[in-house]
Regions:
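Conserved pre-ATP/AMP-binding loop-to-beta segment of ANL
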Residues: 13-14, 117-134, 141, 146, ...
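Conserved AMP-binding/adenylate-forming core of the ANL superfamily
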Residues: 14-46, 55, 61, 88-91, ...
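Conserved AMP-binding/adenylate-forming
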Residues: 23, 40-85, 377
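Conserved AMP-binding A3 loop
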Residues: 26-28, 130-157
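Conserved AMP-binding/adenylation subdomain of ANL enzymes
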Residues: 153-170, 178-224, 238
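Gly/Ser/Thr-rich phosphate-binding loop
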Residues: 222-227, 233-300
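Conserved ATP/PPi-binding loop(s) of AMP-dependent carboxylate-activating enzymes
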Residues: 305-312, 316-344, 376-378
């Protein structure tokens, strides 16, 4: 296995590699366009094996894939940036890793091979970082997780052992490429030399584009699909007979917990759902349900099992918390900080869980305040920082509340500055400039004074308990989840 579009072009030149915006490309044709982009980056000073990352706005366009594969060939670390990030969010990530250049594919010219310069291509060591992927941190800003080529290749090999590949397999990419879940769909497809079909959601996000998503599954004969449970739930409602029309072999569910009801509904409709558990730091997967999936969900206390660890991955439970070790682990956080691994090489996830030798791993929730909404990780402290920068906000506590569709929604309890009244419209106009929409609160309440501890710190537990009866939904438009 390799993550080289050139190697794929040699091994399967005429096989379809990419379907994007109506364009169909073989591995050979795609490799030619990637090579044509080399002169462009060379003129901008990007050199092979350059340790400085290249920031790429991952808009899902054909040009974006060309830059993506070119970074893989050059051994230049990739910083994937979500198109919906605000300017301050984008600037922070670029500064944090010292990215040398930001590419916006939507502003690029088509790739044309205007010269026949015989470029020298490096042999890229597997230890080299392939991507720096944003993940929620505890400082009010995302952490950047360094993932090596070795980690992505280890995941591709383990995935092929869990779900044996077929020559006819076609994978649909509908997850954001700024997340490791989306990026790993691309790397697994490239490593397996299979076609990746890129689906671009409309302005209402993936949840608002479910009918089009279902049609793509059918039209493109998709066999492999990765989703968050919220999207699967809507797919079941909109297209209950999907299994009769699309040749789906495996639907990998991740990003949030899958309910027993959703699993049962999917299996009743003959959809091959594989629950999974993973983190950005584990290259998206730690464990996955056995393939083919059972008809009934393996349950413990109403929680659906996420199966057994992937090949080469070790999982242990210490004091009720999940720890992970294996070749898919990240190399560390950009900028260092606390050592992420213990003396035995285990990464402490902070997630509560239990391992059953017959039923597999069960994940019971996080030991932190992280909110996971529709598969998106939201750090409450980041949202609180943004709120405190808004006029009239004295204090804020952000937390997650249960939501039947998204798993959780972001909620906030506010304390206003003296003499100020809440202007909801003005508040969210300010938040629109600071936070992506999925990070913004969907429910709120206002306290005269938020409960505090004797030290003066906010008493987050009391705030949550007292806010429960006071929260009201925020009247905003339909949420674009992804």
């Amino acid at each position: 296995m390799s993550l080289s579009i050139f190697a794929a072009a040699r091994e399967a030149p005429h096989a379809e590699a990419l379907v994007c915006d109506g364009e169909r490309s073989t591995f050979s044709a795609l490799a030619e366009r990637v090579q044509a982009r080399r002169a462009e980056l060379d003129a901008l000073g990007v050199q092979p094996l350059d340790p400085r990352p290249l920031a790429l706005i991952v808009d899902g366009s054909p040009a974006m894939f060309e830059y993506l594969y070119l970074c893989f060939e050059l051994g230049v670390p990739l910083l994937p940036l979500h198109p919906r990030l605000t300017a301050p969010e984008r600037a922070y990530l670029i500064r944090a890793c010292g990215a040398q250049l930001t590419i916006e594919p939507s502003q690029s010219e088509p790739a044309v091979n205007r010269d026949a310069k015989p470029w020298a291509w490096p042999k890229v060591p597997e230890s080299r970082p392939l991507a720096l992927v944003p993940s929620s941190g505890s400082t009010g800003h995302p952490k950047l997780v360094e993932l090596s080529r070795r980690a992505f290749l280890a995941l591709a090999r383990a995935d092929a052992q869990r779900v044996p590949p077929r020559v006819s397999d076609r994978a649909l990419l509908c997850l954001p490429l700024s997340h490791v879940g989306g990026l790993s769909v691309v790397t697994r497809s490239l490593a397996a030399r299979r076609c990746c079909v890129a689906f671009r959601a409309g302005s209402t996000g993936l949840l608002g584009s479910v009918p089009e998503l279902a049609q793509s599954l059918i039209d493109e004969r998709i066999s492999l699909l990765s989703l968050v449970p919220a999207v699967l739930a809507r797919l079941l409602r909109k297209t209950p007979a999907l299994a009769a029309h699309a040749p789906l072999r495996a639907i990998l569910l991740g990003g949030q917990a899958c309910s027993a009801e959703l699993f049962a509904a999917a299996r009743e409709r003959s959809l091959p759902v594989l629950t999974s558990y993973g983190l950005t730091e584990t290259c998206s997967q730690v464990s996955t349900l056995a393939f083919p999936p059972p008809l009934a969900a393996p349950l413990k206390n109403g929680v659906v099992s996420v199966g057994f660890p992937l090949e080469g991955v070790d999982v242990r439970i210490v004091n009720g918390l999940i720890q992970v070790r294996g070749p898919t682990l990240f190399s560390g956080y950009v900028g260092g900080g606390d050592a992420p691994f213990d003396a035995q090489g285990f990464f402490h996830t902070g997630d509560r869980g239990e391992f059953d030798p017959e039923l597999g791993l069960f994940v019971f929730g996080r030991n932190s305040e992280l909110v996971i909404t529709g598969g998106e990780n939201v750090d409450p402290s980041e949202v609180e920082h943004a709120l405190l920068a808004c006029a009239g906000i004295e204090a804020a506590v952000v937390f997650g509340i249960p939501d039947p569709e998204f798993g959780e929604q972001v909620a906030v309890a506010l304390e206003l500055s003296a003499g100020r009244a809440l202007d909801e419209r003005a508040l969210f106009e300010q938040l629109d400039q600071r936070l992506a929409s999925f990070k913004q609160p969907r429910a709120l309440c206002v306290f005269d004074a938020l409960p505090r501890l004797g030290s003066g710190k906010l008493d987050r537990a009391r705030v949550r308990a007292q806010a429960a009866a006071q929260l009201r939904p925020i009247a905003r438009g339909p949420r674009a989840s992804r």
